[in-house]
Design a protein with these regions (language model features):
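Extended, low-polarity transmembrane helix blocks
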Residues: 2-7, 11-56, 76-84, 88-162
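Membrane-interface interhelical connector segments
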Residues: 59-73
Length: 162
């Protein structure tokens, strides 16, 4: 019985409970309200993950892509556009230099990739039950988000770090 009475004495009233919860939520929101850091994380994720795809093509050469393009009746030199979309644009996105145009280039690259290899898979699931073109969509939507939001404060392309 003593423990319950002690607990009752320590417990706050309804008004104090509401104030305490409001204070906790306000502190939590202030702690996480870093839009520029969120933009940096988005840039690092979208640009960094796409860069893995681009570096692979850079190391192996563009011959494989050029072969796919010529098989579809397109000129092989377009394969170098893949390097722009999967190496140069992600580097610019990561660094925050010309971020919006670079993100639009990346989004366009994903549309071209979908037209080249994904149109037949648009309404299919893969063997794990995931959408067959979900990676393309992640990069496409992520690039559009970067294009809409911009680089934010933590970017080399800013005149100054406000």
């Amino acid at each position: 019985m003593v423990k319950c009475d002690a607990f009752r004495r320590l417990s706050l009233g309804k008004k104090e409970n509401i104030q305490m919860v409001t204070h906790i939520l306000t502190t939590f929101n202030r702690t996480l309200a870093h839009e520029d850091f969120g933009k940096l994380l988005l840039r690092l994720a979208v640009g960094g993950l796409m860069l893995f795809h681009g570096v692979h093509k850079l190391i192996d050469g563009v011959e494989g892509i050029a072969g796919m393009l010529t098989a579809q009746g397109l000129p092989a030199f377009i394969a170098y556009g893949v390097l722009v979309g999967e190496v140069l644009a992600p580097c610019l996105i990561i660094l925050g230099i010309a971020t919006r145009p670079a993100a639009l280039v990346l989004a366009f690259t994903m549309i071209v990739a979908w037209l080249m290899v994904g149109t037949g898979k648009t309404w299919l699931l893969d063997n794990t039950g995931a959408w067959a073109i979900e990676n393309l969509m992640y990069f496409f939507v992520g690039a559009l988000a970067v294009a809409c939001l911009g680089a934010g404060r933590y970017a080399l392309g800013q005149a100054q770090w406000r």
